[in-house]
């Protein structure tokens, strides 16, 4: 399965944010999307998931144009989204939050989804009856990812999963995403920790002012002097 964009342009009101963006992610690969605040990364993810309409260009699921499809319809196709800020229901338990991610599953697959989430994040199993609002920041991020995985997505969009986390927890979350990829899921990762992102990703795109300015193998970009100077302070 391939999720791609061709010549994508969009924005808010009269303010254009994305300018002719081309990008793709396939099942079984982790692709990092890098850039400073305001580069357009979150806007791109919101457009991919159907929360924002493109002005021009196309969002493609294989060769199918997703124009006009709602976020719910895209989720049914297999497109998952872990938004920035987690957006959990704090007065619901871990298990209840996870169950919300299974809304589009065929009957009988919910338990399979729980098993998958709890295997990936054993800490969630230990706290399954605990209110989400009482979890630590790292545990809440694990829950947000687990909820998205309950729908068995083919492609998963993940926005700033390590935001506000201690370095050890940030690494734990990104390594968990790498295990998700090993199961065959494609992940498009927006992440502030550029060095760690490039270590776990196979490919990467770099955005500036709403445009893709660099792309390629993550290992090569990690050694690119422009990336090292702009994002790694080297």
Protein language model features and the residues they cover:
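Conserved ABC ATPase signature
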Residues: 131-135, 139
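Conserved ABC transporter NBD signature motif
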Residues: 57-65, 77, 110-114
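ABC ATPase C-loop
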Residues: 148-149
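The feature captures the beta-strand-to-loop junction immediately N-terminal to the Walker
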Residues: 34-36
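ABC-type ATPase nucleotide-binding domains, specifically the catalytic core motifs of the NBD
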Residues: 13, 69, 94-112, 120-125, ...
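Helix-to-loop junction immediately C-terminal to a conserved catalytic motif
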Residues: 49
């Amino acid at each position: 399965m391939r999720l791609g964009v061709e010549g994508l342009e969009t924005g808010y009101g009269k303010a254009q944010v994305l300018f002719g963006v081309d990008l793709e992610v396939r099942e079984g690969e982790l692709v990092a999307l890098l850039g400073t605040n305001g580069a357009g990364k979150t806007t791109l993810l919101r457009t991919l998931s159907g929360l924002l309409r493109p002005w021009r260009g196309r969002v493609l699921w294989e060769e199918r144009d997703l124009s006009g499809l709602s976020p719910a319809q895209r989720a049914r196709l297999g497109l998952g989204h872990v938004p920035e800020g987690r957006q959990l229901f704090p007065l619901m338990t871990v298990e209840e939050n996870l169950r919300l991610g299974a809304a589009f599953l065929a009957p009988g697959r919910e338990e399979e989804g729980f098993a998958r989430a709890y295997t990936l994040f054993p800490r969630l199993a230990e706290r399954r009856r605990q209110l989400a609002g009482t979890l630590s920041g790292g545990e809440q991020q694990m829950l947000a990812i687990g909820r998205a995985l309950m729908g068995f997505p083919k492609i998963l969009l993940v926005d700033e999963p390590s935001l506000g986390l201690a370095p050890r927890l940030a690494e734990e979350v990104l390594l968990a995403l790498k295990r998700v990829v090993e199961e065959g899921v494609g992940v498009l990762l927006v992440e502030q920790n550029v060095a760690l992102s490039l270590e776990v990703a196979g490919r990467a795109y770099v955005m500036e002012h709403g445009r893709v300015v660099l792309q390629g193998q993550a290992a090569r970009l990690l050694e690119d002097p422009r990336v090292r100077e702009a994002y790694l302070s080297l």
